[in-house]
Amino acid sequence: RPGRLDVKIKLDRPDAAAAAEILARYLDGRTPLTTGGVDAAEFRRGLIDAIVERLYARSDANRFIEVTYAGGDREVLHVADFVSGAMLAGIVGRAKKAAIKELIGGGERGLRHDHVLSACAAEIAENEELPNTTNPDDWARISGRKGERIVFLRTLVGSRALNPS
């Protein structure tokens, strides 16, 4: 179409600081909160910190997949290695939807920590299907890893193994 630009721009996955900035755009001053008497700005910052901490912790709970490279080296990738702006938007959207459903059901108005933590868990669970591709080239593209070819994938969520060969 005239005037349309078909330019692809590669963006790296956000680190924890960038994720916090992205989340601040979605959890702005217009988002109703159930603060329990805490300053709204401080509470909002706490929600953002809770999401970032849940996604970026290099803990056993966040181990996502183990890749084996052609040279035999192995690497464990965590949830943080797959975070995207879309995932962050999805978490906030899920949390807001949960808060709205609760309000409609007679609950309190506003977003709470349990809403965002449940939304994180749901978004991570949905993304557990991500490694189901068996093409190593697709996998390298999805994970954003460059360099040596991936020859074997083992999901650490549900202990399934995928062999791309």
Model-found features: residue ranges?
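Glycine-rich loops and low-complexity Gly/Arg-rich segments
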Residues: 9-12, 32-37, 136, 140-144
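C-terminal engagement/docking regions of AAA+ P-loop ATPases
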Residues: 67-165
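Conserved C-terminal "switch" segment of AAA+ ATPases
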Residues: 12-87, 97-106
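A short helix-turn-beta junction within AAA+ P-loop NTPase domains corresponding to the substrate/partner-engaging
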Residues: 1-13
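A generic structural signal for secondary-structure junctions
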Residues: 1, 24-28, 121
